[in-house]
Amino acid sequence: LLGESEERIKKARGTRQRHERQQLHDFMIFSVHTGMRVNEVLATKYRDCKIKKNKKEGLLLVIQNVSGKNDIREVIGLVGAVKVYERLKERNIHEPNDLLFPQHHRDQLNTLLKEAGMKTDTLGNIRNARSFRSTYIMFRLRWGTPIKTIATNCGNSSHVIDKYYAKYITPKDLEEQL
């Protein structure tokens, strides 16, 4: 999907279309590297983000004041989110209270998914912006991140992660941890 997105950026007609496609591209990466809900990503402001060094992961993006379903929490984004944040700061004219992603590119994402032949998954489920959160959760499970850690970062319960995601993990996915 990212490869198709990069091609669409190259083929953009005009500065505005290129900017919108870059924003969508970065929205996808940011979402997959934070596990945040779509509405949480769309509500994130520049002032909420701080880059932090971590011995294990390298650079992380700490996102404060994330208002989720049940509470306000802090989210830790992986290095991909750091890179997106740095690109957004460089590319966009912004103030601390401005949103990272001031608009939802729903139609653009649907077009991209269709062009990439990825609008539905192998089970026939429709993909959309919420799918990036699921991708984050599945990647973290496959990398051996404890369910409680994933749940805390995503603003979910361990039960939800176990019930809806962990059931898809196979022994092959866990070879390195076993």
Spans of model-derived segments:
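C-terminal secondary-structure termini that scaffold catalytic or DNA-interacting sites
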Residues: 6-7, 53-54, 90-95, 163, ...
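C-terminal catalytic core of Y-nucleophile DNA break-rejoin enzymes
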Residues: 65-87, 92-115, 128
